[in-house]
Curated annotation (Swiss-Prot):
It comes from Schizosaccharomyces pombe (strain 972 / ATCC 24843). One of its GO terms (molecular function) is proton transmembrane transporter activity. The gene is atp18. This is ATP synthase subunit J, mitochondrial. InterPro entries: ATP_synth_F0_jsu. F-type ATPases have 2 components, CF(1) - the catalytic core - and CF(0) - the membrane proton channel. In yeast, the dimeric form of ATP synthase consists of 17 polypeptides: alpha, beta, gamma, delta, epsilon, 4 (B), 5 (OSCP), 6 (A), 8, 9 (C), d, E (Tim11), f, g, h, i/j and k. Belongs to the ATPase j subunit family.
Length: 60
């Protein structure tokens, strides 16, 4: 069957790319956890640029 003149070939795409997708997901997860840990640190807890700054009380 031809779709706009293109033939269908059984070329594997997902299987060879799976390690790269998993690696990207692991790096993304680690980056998010590191960012959250840095925002919760004592040094940046009351920084006005911190999006979570309003969640902490003045006793921190």
């Amino acid at each position: 069957m031809s779709f706009f003149g293109l033939k269908r070939y059984s070329t594997p795409i997902l299987k060879p790319m799976l390690p790269f997708f998993l690696g990207g997901a692991i790096v993304f997860y680690g980056t998010v956890k590191l960012r959250d840990a840095m925002m919760d640190s004592a040094e940046y807890r009351n920084d006005p640029r911190n999006p979570k700054a309003g969640k902490y009380g003045s006793d921190h």
